């Protein structure tokens, strides 16, 4: 068994960081005040502590490199044997955002790492995937490219008020868009492969399956590893109703052979709204069917109302409180959607955007004792460790906050925890997010409802105005902005915006909310004029106030209306 490495430290034994390590790892600690080491045998949460013996490893790109030898000092930690050779220190199943981040960070810390991924495809399946994962290949990136494409029709319409005239009506070629989009995806997956290669991460193509806590099978080839990371993401979910075989999901919607003429989109979440905006902008007839009264469950109520109204003004038809019951194919090839309220006919496509499920099927996790939720999500602790000490999970497969930047954060934190002796919890405070609907949404922090529940005394500032650009275009576009402030501390608890450039604007305010800035800090900040963003630093009087004992939910007579509107 490898000897326990000695950590010479000038940190006091009362240091929280040192106390954490002492609780989690078997360490021989040398402190300045101690003349001899004391060995601490401790529980299993972290898997390994490492000696610094050099090792030469041969990777798939045939380059040799020297790395630190990471050997588990106590087999009771994660079951790995300290004197046994393992092919890798970390084997990751899934080369999406979280898996790639964890793998390349691991090698930068001196560990050996491999990642396996299915062959490239724009549509995921049990046999196809691709390096880059959902975000790069069938999520954030291709969707945003289609959002850009769809916005041009609005720009053409806007431009008339600014003097632009067109001899012919602009037309759109769907085939060109999809071909160019797919070429960009091929370029991006190549970049990701290059990143892995440069980081000395071995990339293995194939489907990975966990055989035991330290063994992975990739299409019949066996690899041993000290730690396994599951980062396989999720897949679109279509409910089991008659005619479901006629439905498309978000993967297919990004890669259709032809543009829809009339499309039914079932779902009221961000994916449904984003695709509704895309197809509406590309001059398709769009109908959105939602089970609830409003779209975007979980978002701020004012934002939910505002975005629904604005999208309706652009010609999208919302069918509220309707549940899908069946899809019926007509003799002419068109589809009808039967709902709890009736039947709507004549659709060229029926799309379901009814959520995503963790992609944990056929990974062998049940056989090794990994605990999962009813929806298939892998249950993890605050350090992303599963119920099996040597198996970890990050990203959408854990169903925590299903955002690409969050998966990146989780992957980086895991690598630090395992291979840098730096136990790191992902920080989920004040995570900003965006919905690329049209108009788009940017939000960070608490909703009004959450703030009232958690703090009681809350001041709400809102502004609903016509942006400068719309004054000449003559279009009904408006912008909604909202600040939620703790009345007792003056701390800004939430920032919400719906309108052009909201996602770009919210990133900066995400820093402000994370830093704990106050409304006074906002008020003391000079605005940039003329911009929509300056509204966030010029809203002086609250629209309404809420107090624990009594609610003043009425509009303030001093409520601010945007200047110049």
Swiss-Prot record:
Keyword entries, A-Z: Chloroplast, Disulfide bond, FAD, Flavoprotein, NADP, Oxidoreductase, Plastid, Redox-active center, Transit peptide
Record field: compositional bias (Basic and acidic residues): 548-557
Gene Ontology molecular-function annotations: ATP binding; copper ion binding; flavin adenine dinucleotide binding; glutathione-disulfide reductase (NADPH) activity; NADP binding
Location of the region described as Disordered in the Swiss-Prot/TrEMBL record: 544-565
PROSITE patterns the record matches: PYRIDINE_REDOX_1
InterPro entries linked to this entry: FAD/NAD-bd_sf, FAD/NAD-binding_dom, FAD/NAD-linked_Rdtase_dimer_sf, GSHR, GSHR/TRXR-like, Pyr_nuc-diS_OxRdtase, Pyr_nucl-diS_OxRdtase_dimer, Pyr_OxRdtase_I_AS
Segment annotated as transit peptide: 1-74
Cofactor binding remark: Binds 1 FAD per subunit.
Biological process annotations from GO: cell redox homeostasis; glutathione metabolic process
Cofactor(s) named in the record: FAD
Disulfide feature: 135-140
E.C. designation(s): 1.8.1.7
Annotated catalytic residues: 529 (proton acceptor)
Record's subcellular location: Plastid, Chloroplast
Residues involved in FAD binding: 97-98, 117, 134-135, 143, 208, 396, 404, 529
Reactions performed catalytically: 2 glutathione + NADP(+) = glutathione disulfide + NADPH + H(+)
Binding site for glutathione: 97, 192
GO CC list: chloroplast; chloroplast stroma; cytosol; mitochondrion
Chain positions recorded as NADP(+) binding sites: 268, 271, 274, 291, 297, 355, 434
Family: Belongs to the class-I pyridine nucleotide-disulfide oxidoreductase family.
Record's miscellaneous remark: The active site is a redox-active disulfide bond.
Subunit and interaction comment: Homodimer.
Purpose: Catalyzes the reduction of glutathione disulfide (GSSG) to reduced glutathione (GSH). Maintains high levels of GSH in the chloroplast.
Protein name per its UniProtKB record: Glutathione reductase, chloroplastic
